[in-house]
């Protein structure tokens, strides 16, 4: 089955790395720069590198915000990556702009810790908090690559699919709600573990898409 997956380009994402990760999985991506590019897409990817306010400003300029809200409201698959996860929430301590509000909750600065440096940069082992199509039940613990200073605080803790230890606390690593998924880490920079996660998402997506036809 051939999937049509859109990669949103709003000037704040590491598009090349994401494209290359999916290319290794024999999956091409279609660049989405505006509403007219969304036709025939089965799923969307919202990447992100940088700060919250400039990201929301750039996204606003693409005229994609109403379309993204309709996309998720219609229960279509979307995958957020790093800053892309944070934009899904209502607000962020990093800026004054409103987020997309597709998930209830906010983005907070990482808690100060004598055991951890900020920004949180490097490899960390995931804790699986609930069953999620991004992870296989019999898989070994996954290590992913993080680069961030802020983390999501979902209003509904059931939205958290995976967390990671940070000092004496746990912070959000993966959210999953209906067909909306997002990860704080960079799967495209996480070697075999990241590749496996993206492969699991594609397998789930193919099943979901097949069931529609």
From Swiss-Prot:
The active site is at residues 82, 186, 188. GO terms for molecular function: glutaminase activity; imidazoleglycerol-phosphate synthase activity; lyase activity. It comes from Prochlorococcus marinus (strain SARG / CCMP1375 / SS120). PANTHER family: IMIDAZOLE GLYCEROL PHOSPHATE SYNTHASE SUBUNIT HISH (PTHR42701:SF1). It is found in: Cytoplasm. Pathway: Amino-acid biosynthesis; L-histidine biosynthesis; L-histidine from 5-phospho-alpha-D-ribose 1-diphosphate: step 5/9. IGPS catalyzes the conversion of PRFAR and glutamine to IGP, AICAR and glutamate. The HisH subunit catalyzes the hydrolysis of glutamine to glutamate and ammonia as part of the synthesis of IGP and AICAR. The resulting ammonia molecule is channeled to the active site of HisF. Keywords: Amino-acid biosynthesis, Cytoplasm, Glutamine amidotransferase, Histidine biosynthesis, Hydrolase, Lyase. One of its GO terms (cellular component) is cytoplasm. InterPro entries: Class_I_gatase-like, GATASE, Imidazole-glycPsynth_HisH. The lineage of its organism: Bacteria, Bacillati, Cyanobacteriota, Cyanophyceae, Synechococcales. This is Imidazole glycerol phosphate synthase subunit HisH. The keyword Lyase applies. The gene is hisH. Heterodimer of HisH and HisF. Its EC number is 4.3.2.10, 3.5.1.2. It catalyses: 5-[(5-phospho-1-deoxy-D-ribulos-1-ylimino)methylamino]-1-(5-phospho-beta-D-ribosyl)imidazole-4-carboxamide + L-glutamine = D-erythro-1-(imidazol-4-yl)glycerol 3-phosphate + 5-amino-1-(5-phospho-beta-D-ribosyl)imidazole-4-carboxamide + L-glutamate + H(+); L-glutamine + H2O = L-glutamate + NH4(+). GO terms for biological process: L-histidine biosynthetic process. Residues 4-211 form the Glutamine amidotransferase type-1 domain.
